[in-house]
Swiss-Prot record:
Belongs to the calycin superfamily. Lipocalin family. It is found in: Secreted. SUPFAM superfamilies: Lipocalins. Keywords: Disulfide bond, Milk protein, Retinol-binding, Secreted, Transport. The keyword Secreted applies. InterPro entries: Blactoglobulin (IPR002447), Calycin (IPR012674), Lipocalin (IPR002345), Lipocalin_CS (IPR022272), Lipocln_cytosolic_FA-bd_dom (IPR000566). Disulfide bonds join C66-C160, C106-C119. This is Beta-lactoglobulin-1. GO terms for cellular component: extracellular region. Monomer. It holds the Pfam family Lipocalin.
Length: 162
């Protein structure tokens, strides 16, 4: 896999709650280049399940409207890595989180790791935080991502409403 597992343990209960997609990065521009791009998804909430899986509530544009989806990330032996089934992506890796302010994750296709890689920076509030953005940028340096999108708080609030 392309994405290194840098987190030792992940406390799922602590990542629960509302989040905002403040920045995205991808290995290929077509994954993010338009509102309707396949992996341009806006995370709303993370919900741990009783079996230590993670339910991800997200929104994306489809047929000119914003739709809400639920994606189940199933736990693996490694705390920060989950198996998912979303489009061609089959792994979700949590790169880093401090639980209170930010969480970085990547989605990848383990069978073609260099082709489809998308990472996101989630924040708890809509406040732009340069320190977190720099940290996200550093976390991406070892990854084959060539496209980055940073949203300002106003854009985030408007990005996909239901």
């Amino acid at each position: 896999a392309t994405v290194p597992l840098t987190m030792d343990g992940l406390d799922l209960q602590k990542v629960a709650g509302m989040w905002h997609s403040m920045a995205m990065a991808a290995s290929d521009i077509s994954l993010l280049d338009s509102e309707t791009a396949p992996l341009r998804v806006y995370v709303q909430e993370l919900r741990p399940t009783p079996r230590d899986n993670l339910e991800i509530i997200l929104r994306k544009w489809e047929d000119n409207r914003c739709v809400e989806k639920k994606v189940l990330a199933e736990k693996t032996e490694c705390a920060a890595k989950f198996n998912i089934n979303y489009l061609d992506e089959n792994e979700l890796i949590v790169l880093d989180t401090d639980y209170e302010n930010y969480l970085f994750f990547c989605l990848e296709n383990a069978d073609a790791p260099d082709q489809n890689l998308v990472c996101q920076c989630l924040t708890r509030t809509l406040k732009a935080d340069n320190e977190v953005m720099e940290k996200f940028d550093r976390a991406l340096q070892t990854l084959p991502v060539h496209v980055r999108l940073f949203f300002d708080p106003t854009q985030v609030a408007e990005q996909c409403r239901i």
